[in-house]
Amino acid sequence: MSHNTFGHLFRVTTWGESHGPALGCVVDGCPPGVPLTEADIQPWLDRRRPGQGKFVTQRQEPDAVRILSGVFQDERTTAKFGGQVTTGTPISLIIENTDQRSRDYSEIATSFRPGHADYPYFAKYGVRDYRGGGRSSARETAARVAAGAIARKLLPGVTIRGAVVQIGPHAVDPGRIDFSVTGDNPFWAPDPEIVPVWERHLEQVRKAGSSTGAVVAVEATGVPAGWGAPLYGKLDAELAAALMSINAAKGVEIGAGFAAAALSGEENADEMRMGNEGPLFLSNKAGGVLGGISTGQPVTARVAFKPTSSILTPRRSLDEAGREIELRTKGRHDPCVGIRAVPVVEAMVACVLADALLRHRAQTGGGAHVLGENPKS
């Protein structure tokens, strides 16, 4: 199996399966001299950790991370940097799996669960780890969150915040989105008034043994103008690819996204004026990216997640012999996978932006052209 790595200069390779002994990642391209310990990574993993509410999977995993390589500490690093730092070599991270229940999946060893990757994995490789979905499980995203924690260390001036803005048919009013309150409820909701609505909806879904979809919004503020490159290194294209790679993601919008198709040119074009500290945009339909290059506006995106395919309702399917069967999925599953996707979405944005920063420095030296400056003679 190839294609387990993403990024160009800041490269992340994830490894491991849902019911294997461990999973993790290797981060290559992180510059040397960046202070880094497990304590810098663990809080981000704790935000994603399963078993923290009745509307998410009850699998109990501590998600304790260990750094195996790529860091060093002695008297000189302590004196210069204050402790352990990156060395510029590959950083290997490991997270042990401790709460596997593989017996829940014994009945589907030769059957294909509708909506899952079981059949395409079998069609491509001829062999698959059916326990919890193996490599295709959302358990893999723990490694992405760990990598994202390292990426954030390269982005001290950038703030990345995500929120669930829709569960099932119930969406947050865009005018009421407040990212600062997402930590006050179990749904990452940016509007407290939507919480009881989602609770009632999810309770109905859970009791029915079914599932529901969600939309996650993310914004990155503090991204300077100039990151990204035309034509095939567009920042929005890199973001879209990274976000679409997340398990259960079925759609990505940058800025106004598909809504832009219904706008006029006057409505969609973000007008500009000159402010005291540089250009000011009067709107942000572009989502902070024009021509594939950041504008200095907040970079914004939305990701649509499908309903969890593991449901208790019997469904028609096939087995490996081609026989028609009726299948009822067992195991511990999220009735709405989008709820726990917020830290994953944030992490993927962080990795893309860290990569964009390093590529920008490599191409231009990191400088930016400032409006109003006279060219050197």
UniProtKB/Swiss-Prot annotation:
It holds the Pfam family Chorismate_synt. It catalyses: 5-O-(1-carboxyvinyl)-3-phosphoshikimate = chorismate + phosphate. Pathway: Metabolic intermediate biosynthesis; chorismate biosynthesis; chorismate from D-erythrose 4-phosphate and phosphoenolpyruvate: step 7/7. Its EC number is 4.2.3.5. One of its GO terms (cellular component) is cytosol. NADP(+) binds at residue 48. PANTHER family: CHORISMATE SYNTHASE. Belongs to the chorismate synthase family. This is Chorismate synthase. It comes from Phenylobacterium zucineum (strain HLK1).
